[in-house]
């Protein structure tokens, strides 16, 4: 196997879809036992009161949209998946729908997550937003 230069690797990554890149990152993290997440600083303070913990949970600003089931109208779901996930070809969308449950959108705004969920549920799909 020939060694690829950094520029060649970047060119390969540019050709990949977001889903393919996401799968690559997951495999990379598993293989080398690392994480691509940015380190988070945690300030040590007193334990929050019960009311404060509830408020923190309500302040979530990024959501993941997960396709749980395609339902009976798989073709309609594939069309909506292609619309929602940018840069996705027909084959990739079909593979994604066939391999449920799958993450469709990661860390999107609440409006985008709710809009995607509504469009998918209108076609008969089962969707969860986390």
From Swiss-Prot:
Which top-level group of life is the source organism from? Bacteria
Gene3D superfamilies attached to this UniProt entry: 3.30.1390.10, Single helix bin
State the CDD domains in the record.
Ribosomal_L7_L12
Instruction: List the GO terms this entry assigns under cellular component, sorted alphabetically.
Output: cytosolic large ribosomal subunit
Q: Which Pfam families does this one have?
A: Ribosomal_L12, Ribosomal_L12_N
A single GO molecular function term of this UniProt record: mRNA binding
Which GO biological-process labels does this protein carry? Answer: translation
Keyword list (alphabetical) reads:
Ribonucleoprotein, Ribosomal protein
Question: What protein family does this chain belong to?
Answer: Belongs to the bacterial ribosomal protein bL12 family.
Q: Its function? A: Forms part of the ribosomal stalk which helps the ribosome interact with GTP-bound translation factors. Is thus essential for accurate translation.
Q: How does it assemble?
A: Homodimer. Part of the ribosomal stalk of the 50S ribosomal subunit. Forms a multimeric L10(L12)X complex, where L10 forms an elongated spine to which 2 to 4 L12 dimers bind in a sequential fashion. Binds GTP-bound translation factors.
Name of this protein: Large ribosomal subunit protein bL12
Taxonomically, what lineage is the organism?
A: Bacteria, Bacillati, Actinomycetota, Actinomycetes, Mycobacteriales
């Amino acid at each position: 196997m020939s060694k690829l230069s950094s520029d060649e690797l970047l060119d390969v990554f540019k050709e990949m879809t977001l889903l393919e890149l996401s799968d690559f990152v997951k495999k990379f993290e598993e293989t080398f036992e690392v994480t691509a997440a940015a380190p988070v600083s945690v300030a040590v303070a007193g334990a929050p009161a019960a009311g404060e913990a509830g408020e923190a949970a309500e302040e979530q600003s990024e959501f993941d949209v997960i396709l749980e089931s395609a339902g009976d109208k798989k073709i309609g779901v594939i069309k909506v998946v292609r619309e929602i996930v940018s840069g996705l070809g027909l084959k990739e969308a079909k593979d994604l729908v066939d391999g449920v449950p799958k993450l469709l959108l990661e860390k999107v705004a609440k409006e985008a997550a709710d809009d995607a969920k509504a469009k998918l549920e209108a076609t008969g799909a089962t969707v969860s937003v986390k």
